[in-house]
């Protein structure tokens, strides 16, 4: 009788040998006394054969039926189910009982197809692999008995290929179709859809079934353009970015499987660039057009519009890029100051002009609403002489032609604000500034170029009046005391908003033409006299 002893049966046995199946197995052949007559191990290759088709001795044909991959059986075959009364000359004597220690390695049928078992699938799957798509995936490749023959993980790089155009073995071409990014599946491929009778000449023997444990990381098609997903669009969007605009934005950059490769947030500063001029990758150039300040959008960029086949830094070659961006502000180099008046008193006859002394309150913010500064929090006004360079040029422009009590919003582009450098720790570089302003007080200034004017007629003996000790020389102390008296008595007026001592010293220095610290009658001239002399010379 045929004797079959199951010495090891794996816990999992999804499939057992049936007549007509093709098997690969190892064996030791011995006589009952233990004398070995054959071994597949000695030859270094499995025995490969169809079961139930008369290609084996009858006893082995029967003994293999019902076996699982990785199962081990001890088989006793009587001579009438083996080589009978004739035996095999020189190897097996007549009427010999044969013992076989069998280990099943592989099993398939010519009717088999590719088997796909998905064991993880993301909840969101906006796109699946189609013919002609380009994919990047990791895999572990094993035989049916679990022996590893290859792994992309060991090489620490994905396998990158087109699907469905013959770049892969036919079974893998089929097995990858319909996958989502992030999906994990086991693809079992019979040899006639893999490397066939000859194997690959290296690690994979002939007639081997292959098992690939695959995780899909990336997917695109060469015909893809960028994809934009609007995540947040402000209700108010007065202006959208155009080619030539300069943008400041934050971003998180990830691969399609969610792997982070870069983030402006980690550097605590925005990414600042022109749009549509080739300063950024082509896909980002396109994806940043038409955005509003404050908008959040996701831009998905295929590799031919990103970093191509070579990649860069942490970005692998042929990688789809996902940028989650937040637009902080944008402007155009041709922009000027923008003024929006919210309130203007009905009696608005005196308008601010260059040289006027202004007191005003303001709230300063970035274009996205981030508060930078506020005079209200300081409890005092901000005081300047308009047009004197005490504020940025854009503010000088924005405060022109205001009346007391007026409220307005002034938007200042960076080239009229703090420029590319900004103010360290306070104002970012290339930032658009928004000032909400209320003018509280206006003191009219003097004509341009004047630091002091008379409110009445000028004394014809002006030098003698200043020279109190009549020594023919005026010192700074005498000059300062005289000017102060004129201001206090209302006979003269100093330019408002400046330090008294600095103005007086400046006036004195202008008169002290030889720089000896004294002004003589010959040096002393009024401004209108100086202008007349210059005219006469001309």
Set out the residue ranges of the language-model regions:
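Cross-family detector of peptidyl-prolyl cis-trans isomerase
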Residues: 1-538
